[in-house]
Regions:
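Cytosolic-side transmembrane helix boundary signature
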Residues: 47-79
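Helical transmembrane-bundle signal
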Residues: 23, 27, 83, 87-90
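Short, Lys/Arg-rich, polar N-terminal cytosolic tail immediately upstream
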Residues: 1-4
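Single conserved hydrophobic/aromatic residue that forms the stacking wall/gate
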Residues: 250-259
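Membrane-embedded alpha-helical segments of integral membrane proteins
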Residues: 11-60
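Membrane-water interface of alpha-helical transmembrane segments
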Residues: 6-13, 17, 40, 66, ...
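A structural signal for short, hydrophobic/glycine-enriched beta-strand patches
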Residues: 82, 89-244
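Residues within membrane-spanning alpha-helices of integral membrane proteins
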Residues: 20, 77-80, 84
Length: 259
């Protein structure tokens, strides 16, 4: 029995080390791929430190150097179990949003902006715009709202860059409304709803797949009662980062999120 307990203990502290190394490795991959200033990747460095500290405490405890009180151990297990359960539940909502199917003949679609570099759209934004262009061609009576202000390092508003891209793809500029004040997803919805005459209108939300669920939640908070998701492909390298990021932001759906 003692050997089983010892093996179980050894397995558990090895798990913490593996988690720390995975977080550190993914942080290095993201930082190399997108730069250290890329949205939210610092969470992986924090995760590496967090799991590394747990590993260190477990090693010191097994060696008899320190002792962790039983009540603290129970509190830790309860907190971790609660956090893991909440994480799984929210990720299930995000995955459900990713599988959304656009409805035909929307009255409006809102294309959510994200960072541009100078005057140039990024890959993530191009993916969103390509979905919007395809939908606009198939649904010629739909009004398009491109939503995004001007952020740091941007020579123009995201809305204007999106407008130019869609016009270059053959979409009539008279169909496109530019909402150019928003700086985050909450403001995207808050300011875009002002251009929608009837909040019961069918409104499609165009954004990257991981972002659909929270965007529709924010749309409801802004007063839109009838929305559907129009998911665009996400960056494959940063996909896990974005999934975790939106999960954490889901519990507080109105902060500045950079999208």
């Amino acid at each position: 029995m003692e050997k089983v307990t010892e093996n179980s203990s050894s397995f558990m502290y090895t798990i913490w080390l593996v988690l720390a190394l995975i977080c550190l490795g993914y942080y290095i991959v993201c930082a190399t791929y997108a730069g250290v200033g890329s949205s939210f990747i610092f969470i992986w460095l924090m995760g590496a430190v967090f799991f590394g500290l747990i590993f260190a405490v477990r090693v010191l405890e097994i060696k008899g150097i320190i002792h962790v009180a039983k009540v603290l151990r129970i509190c830790f297990i309860v907190i971790m179990a609660t956090g893991a359960s909440l994480f799984i539940f929210i990720e299930a909502l995000i995955i459900k949003g990713m599988m959304a199917k656009p409805k035909d003949n929307c009255d409006y679609i809102i294309v959510l902006g994200c960072q541009i570099r100078g005057d140039h759209i990024t890959r993530s934004l191009k993916n969103r715009l390509d979905v919007a262009v395809s939908y606009a061609i198939d649904n010629p009576d739909t009004t398009i709202i491109v939503s995004g202000g001007r952020g740091k390092g941007e020579n123009t508003t995201e809305a204007f860059a999106m407008y130019n891209y869609m016009v270059s793809k053959g979409i009539d500029g008279s169909r496109i409304i530019q909402e150019d004040k928003s700086t985050d997803t909450s403001e995207n919805m808050k300011y875009s709803v002002q251009y929608i005459e009837n909040t019961d209108s069918l409104v499609g939300i165009v954004t990257n797949n991981f972002h659909i669920a929270r965007s529709r939640l924010l749309a409801r908070h802004a007063g839109l009662n009838n929305t559907c998701g129009m998911p665009a492909e996400s960056d494959h390298v940063l996909f896990i980062n974005y999934m975790v990021r939106d999960c954490l932001l889901y519990t507080s759906p109105s902060p500045r999120d950079g999208l």
